[in-house]
Regions:
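Short, compositionally biased low-complexity segments
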Residues: 1-15, 94-105, 192-200, 219
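Active-site nucleotide-donor binding segment shared across nucleotidyl transfer reactions
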Residues: 43-104
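Short, histidine-centered active-site or binding-site loop motifs used for metal coordination
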Residues: 16-19, 100-102, 229-232
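Short, conserved acidic/polar surface loops in the N-terminal third of protein domains
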Residues: 83-87, 107-111, 191
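Metal-dependent nucleotidyltransferase catalytic core
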Residues: 98-141
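Generic detection of long, well-ordered alpha-helical segments
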Residues: 25-32, 115-123, 215, 233
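Catalytic cores of NTP-dependent nucleotidyl/adenyl transfer enzymes across multiple folds
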Residues: 36-40, 123-233
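N-terminal regions immediately upstream of nucleotidyltransferase
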Residues: 1-61, 108-114
């Protein structure tokens, strides 16, 4: 099962002792390490499917087939925290918006490949990426894991890691919830740099940084306001 390395554990203890974590418990820094590792793994996933030219004629200079991407965009409150540093909170949720690119005019996918097939290919890649890091599926007695709804347009996976630090408040579970929703952003996404919270707080001279497609702040805030209005209606 995925757990911190000895060096990572020592770094968190040292940071806590030095007051670098401020009032945050060590379990928060630990969970951020695992969330960041999971996000990095997701950022490395590249899913494409071939679309073939329709009614191709002899001598046509256009390519016979082209690759069409299935993209992931990091979203939600955790994105506001990790990508933009706008909120200071810990979440076990990794919210992802899925963008299914369409073939250009004159091209089409094989009849055997539909939206559900493209989504399932992405879900399988996500599962392989996370289990490859050592995360394990959470076994739930009363629920399936992962959960798929709406023709696989909604997908939710719970994975666990081995916790070294205990959260005395009991609010942090050694789990991550990864939600993928097939709903493209309205505003074009942005590439943002992500890294470990501990390295940011400690001012590391050589931090681990990677890039990931992220939803814009404006769209995230609009979604939060809309969600609040629906709850109050």
């Amino acid at each position: 099962m995925k757990t911190l390395s000895e060096q990572q554990r020592v770094s968190i203890v040292d940071a806590s002792t030095a007051g670098i974590l401020k009032n945050m418990p060590a379990a928060v820094a630990e969970k951020d390490q695992h969330i960041t590792d999971a996000l990095h793994a997701l950022s490395q996933i590249h899913i494409v499917h071939s679309a073939n030219q329709v009614n191709r004629k002899r001598g046509d200079s256009q390519p016979q087939s082209i690759d069409v991407a299935t993209r992931m965009v990091f979203a939600g409150g955790t994105c506001l925290s990790k990508a933009y540093g706008l909120i200071e909170r810990m979440s076990e949720d990794i919210d992802i918006k899925i963008v299914l690119e369409s073939p250009p005019e004159g091209y089409a996918f094989p009849n055997t490949l539909g939206e559900r097939g493209r989504l399932k290919a992405l879900h399988k890649a996500v599962e392989d990426a996370l289990t490859g890091l050592g995360f394990q599926f959470v076994v739930q007695v009363d629920k399936d894991n992962p959960i798929r709804r709406d023709g696989s347009r909604y997908y939710c996976l719970l994975v666990s890691y081995e916790a070294h630090f205990q959260d005395t408040a009991g609010t942090l579970r050694p789990q991550l919830k990864v939600e993928l929703i097939c709903r493209p952003p309205i505003i074009p996404s942005e590439m943002q740099s992500l890294g470990y919270m501990l390295e940011v707080l400690s001012g590391s001279a050589n931090p681990f940084v990677f890039s990931m497609n992220c939803i814009t702040v404006a769209e995230t805030l609009a979604e939060k306001v809309l969600s609040l209005l629906r709850r109050c209606a």
